[in-house]
From Swiss-Prot:
Cofactor note: Binds 1 Fe(2+) ion per subunit.
Enzyme Commission number(s) of this protein: 2.3.1.234
Pfam families the record matches: TsaD
Gene3D superfamilies: 3.30.420.40
UniProt record similarity statement: Belongs to the KAE1 / TsaD family.
Catalytic activity field: L-threonylcarbamoyladenylate + adenosine(37) in tRNA = N(6)-L-threonylcarbamoyladenosine(37) in tRNA + AMP + H(+)
Entry GO CC: cytoplasm
Organism of provenance: Actinobacillus succinogenes (strain ATCC 55618 / DSM 22257 / CCUG 43843 / 130Z)
Protein's name according to its UniProt entry: tRNA N6-adenosine threonylcarbamoyltransferase
Function text: Required for the formation of a threonylcarbamoyl group on adenosine at position 37 (t(6)A37) in tRNAs that read codons beginning with adenine. Is involved in the transfer of the threonylcarbamoyl moiety of threonylcarbamoyl-AMP (TC-AMP) to the N6 group of A37, together with TsaE and TsaB. TsaD likely plays a direct catalytic role in this reaction.
Length: 345
């Protein structure tokens, strides 16, 4: 089965083709970073318009990359949520229209399930086996999920305010870094020195697996403001030191909660996915954690950490092969709880 996957939930337009026998055979991605850079964040209306312009050309490019025609496609998968409603509608409308025109089934895919299963796109020796604990960490979500199979999910904990990626982006903006801020802050943190600044590790002093990053962001803002008041300005080294301290606090918080989740479930496999899973310090810290616990950690390669069509095509092929399909109506869910998804046998 060859499945065309379409991802348009935010500011990346992704189109890919997954073959149940050959694996990923085409992967096309267009990012809107330059479009939104002047605004310091994603502008939903501009994102939707750009998806309209880019999706069809990327579909043609994916077919060409795989040396296929429309007649070779057996099904279409598209992101139906969560995400920006206008952006989601672009991908869903195109997917439903093509499915009708090509007379193939289409299936809606949960964006975060795509991220969760993205490590399955790796080579067999680098894929996790069920069951495992997943840390989904991105600009919009920070969640710990117990995973017992495809669709067999239990939410163990999540952020009660800002997601980790959102806190990265907002703190980067306070430091005057370019958009996208999270990646810029991580690069700057590599130049920082440990010990000059320290930030709290929120909600680690109490039981539970929920997260809170708004207070950490406020602590960073106060530190920046006080330093400017005392010194008159922020040197590049001071910015790097603040970035290092902030990133360390986030990473340590995530590591502490992951350890608790693994102990609570009794599992010894950890998966990290989502845009922030590309963070080098986070990967290193969680690798240390799993080595100490005698377990294994898995994550997608960097190209599959950010939003992409490959993860949508992969999940779509699983659900289409299981007999799932969506109706002709174009239905998107800007807010969609992953635990509502049907489990596959």
């Amino acid at each position: 089965m060859k499945v065309l996957g379409i991802e348009t939930s935010c500011d990346e337009t992704g189109v890919a083709i997954y073959d149940s026998e050959q694996g990923l055979i085409a992967n096309q991605l267009y990012t809107q970073i330059a479009l939104h850079a002047d605004y310091g964040g994603v502008v939903p209306e501009l994102a939707s318009r750009d998806h309209i312009r880019k999706t069809a050309p990327l579909i043609r490019a994916a077919l060409k990359e795989a040396d296929l025609t429309a007649e070779d496609i057996d099904g279409i998968a598209y992101t139906a949520g969560p995400g920006l409603v206008g952006a989601l509608l672009v991908g869903a409308t195109i997917a439903r229209s093509l499915a009708f025109a090509w007379n193939v089934p289409a299936v809606s895919v949960h964006h975060m399930e795509g991220h969760l299963l993205a490590p399955m796109l790796e080579s067999p020796q680098n894929r996790p086996h069920f069951p495992f604990v997943a840390l989904l960490v991105s600009g919009g979500h920070t969640q710990l999920v117990r995973v017992d199979g495809v669709g067999k999910y239990e939410l163990l904990g999540e952020s009660i305010d800002d997601a980790a990626g959102e806190a990265f982006d907002k703190t980067a903006k306070l430091l005057g870094l370019d958009y996208p801020g999270g990646a810029a802050l991580s690069r700057l943190a590599e130049k920082g020195s440990a010990g000059r600044f320290t930030f709290p590790k929120p909600m680690t002093d109490r039981p539970g697996l929920d997260f809170s990053f708004s207070g950490l962001k406020t602590a960073a803002a106060n530190t920046i403001r006080q330093t400017i008041k005392q010194k008159g300005d922020l040197t590049e080294q001071t910015k790097a030191d603040i970035a290092h301290a902030f990133q360390t606090a986030v990473v340590e918080t995530l590591a502490i909660k992951c350890k608790r989740a693994l102990q609570q479930t009794g599992y010894n496999t950890l998966v990290i996915a989502g845009g922030v899973s590309a963070n080098k310090q986070l990967r290193h810290r969680l690798a240390q954690l799993m080595h100490a616990l005698g377990g294994k950690v898995f994550y997608p390669s960097p190209q599959f950490c950010t939003d992409n069509g490959a993860m949508i095509a992969y999940v779509g092929h699983l659900r289409l092969q299981a007999g799932e399909s969506s109706g002709l109506e174009v239905d998107v869910k800007p807010r969609w709880v992953m635990t509502e998804l049907p489990a596959l046998a």
